[in-house]
Every structure is written in structure tokens, then in C-alpha cells.
Amino acid sequence: MPTTNTGAIRDVNIVGAEADAGQQIVRKWMAHLLDANFGNGTPAWYRFGRDLSEYNVDMNPDTELRKNILGNTSFVHSGYEPSGENDTFYAHQGDPLFEALQDIVDGLKTGDACKTSALEVHAWDEQASQTEGTNSNIFTATKQDCYVVPTSYGGGTDGYQIPFQVNYVGDKVKGT
């Protein structure tokens, strides 16, 4: 037999447009980087953005709604399969990421030959420097393994391109 909920909603704290939430975060303050050395030696961090007007990490959540014979619905969230598309990567001579991508294309490499690390830096979240007298900036960041997979190569008269997918795997490790 259905029941009626007669409870009142009280003491609601509304946040959002009217709240004093601080300065809007500028897009360039969320930095996306790849290790262009693909785990071979010291990381060579390449920052996305030179030829991109937009980059998003699609979270691809694994969710399901289940309804039982009593008419109740449950929600199951099993995780994420994050990925991103860098669909306008123009090749620049001497660029270590271009050289790594061209190597993958030339060798039709797969699997761990395409594995590297991704770094996301929250440049709006500057931390106090631990070392006095230095001018270094310290920001919150996360590092995660990923696979970089070229989706095509070629392009038009505007330049040689190697667009690619980034498939993030494993857990993010938070640090500064």
C-alpha cells in the first residue's frame, strides 16, 4: 500500500548563482599534460592547448537503473572509463609528442607501446611554497596512466596532423 510523505523541507541552504562562490575559473588554469617520453627516462611533459580550442575528458560513467518486481528502482554506479580526444594535433618538427605519435603511426604500435602518463594541474589551486626564498609555484595535480592512440594522420593545406585519443586507466594519484 503506498504511503504519503508528509515531511516538510526545512533549513535549505541554497548555493549557486547568488552565492559568493569566488572568481570563475579560467579554462587555461586546468592544464592537461602528457609524458611525451612514454615512460622512457625523465618525463617530458607536453601541455595540450597550442592548436586546441577545446579539450574535454569524457568520464563515460558505467551506470545502470534496476527495477525489481516490487516497483522499486535502484541505481548502480560501477565506475568510469575516462577518455579524451585531441582532434587537432598539428605536427611541429622537434616536438617530442609529435615524434612519439609518429613512431606509433610508423610502427603501428599497440598496447603498452602506447602507454604513458597524464598529468592534470589545477593552476587555480596554488599551494604555499614549502621552501622559503624560491619563486616556484606549487599546484594541486593528479597523475594517471593512459594509452595514447592516434586516430588518423594527414590533414589539409593547413598542416600535417596526428589526432589522437587518450584512454585513462587505473587510479588517479593526487599530489602537488
PLM features: residue spans?
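Short N-terminal helix-initiation segments at or just after the protein's N-terminus
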Residues: 15-33, 98-111, 164-168
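Short, acidic/charged, Gly/Pro-enriched secondary-structure junctions
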Residues: 98-140
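Broad gene-expression machinery/nucleic-acid interaction feature
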Residues: 83-85, 116-118, 161-163
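A broad "ordered helical/assembly scaffold" signature
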Residues: 58, 66-70, 102-108, 118, ...
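Solvent-exposed edge beta-strands and adjacent loop segments
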Residues: 2-93, 143-158
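Short beta-strand and beta-hairpin "edge-sheet" elements
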Residues: 50, 122-174
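Short, cysteine-centered beta-strand-loop-beta hairpins and adjacent loop/turn segments enriched
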Residues: 91-98, 172-175
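Context-gated lysine
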Residues: 28, 67, 109, 115, ...
